[in-house]
């Protein structure tokens, strides 16, 4: 599917299967989410640009590769997106973090923002938006609209699971934003849950219903 990268690494798929199981505990789910987010982050940052820096090892001076440009921004869609941050920040501790509380009004189809906090110079940074689920796509669409309004131009979206319906909606609104996911599942049910899915990621992560 154009514009969508499915991360099929065996460790990602194995951990995702355990997360799907209804008997997986809250603690287990949370631990697996941290582990899988680190693996997903590795893939979504695979093509970051490098430059060289003159360094001194214990033996000699040498030119060595380092990341080029301003620090990354990880943008979490509240609340479930926060579950992906811990593992990603362990991998990229210098990254900046944005938090976005936003939803789409189902009657007006307008984005309703209740919280937004982002680093400065977001227009000069790669922004990786994270949310475990791309179901209808409404929250992700609205969040990215808000980021673009504030100047973000280089954006990627990372999730655990995506539904075909959500992908279509998302790409219709933001065809310039690539999607990275561990799985494209079958469909949405009548309640808007991804099938086969893993349930409500936020509830399973925090032990709520």
From Swiss-Prot:
Keywords: Allosteric enzyme, Glycosyltransferase, GTP-binding, Magnesium, Nucleotide-binding, Transferase
One GO MF term: uracil phosphoribosyltransferase activity
Summary of activators and inhibitors of this protein: Allosterically activated by GTP.
Bound cofactor: record note: Binds 1 Mg(2+) ion per subunit. The magnesium is bound as Mg-PRPP.
Cofactor(s) this protein requires: Mg(2+)
Stored Gene3D superfamilies: 3.40.50.2020
Entry keyword annotation includes Glycosyltransferase: yes
Binding, uracil: 194, 199-201
Catalysed conversion reaction: UMP + diphosphate = 5-phospho-alpha-D-ribose 1-diphosphate + uracil
GO biological process, one term: UMP salvage
UniProt-listed Enzyme Commission number(s): 2.4.2.9
Pathway: Pyrimidine metabolism; UMP biosynthesis via salvage pathway; UMP from uracil: step 1/1
Residues given in the record as 5-phospho-alpha-D-ribose 1-diphosphate binding sites: 79, 104, 131-139, 200
HAMAP family xrefs: Upp_B
Task of the protein: Catalyzes the conversion of uracil and 5-phospho-alpha-D-ribose 1-diphosphate (PRPP) to UMP and diphosphate.
Cited NCBIfam families: PRK00129.1, upp
Family (UniProt): Belongs to the UPRTase family.
Protein name in the entry: Uracil phosphoribosyltransferase
Gene behind this protein: upp
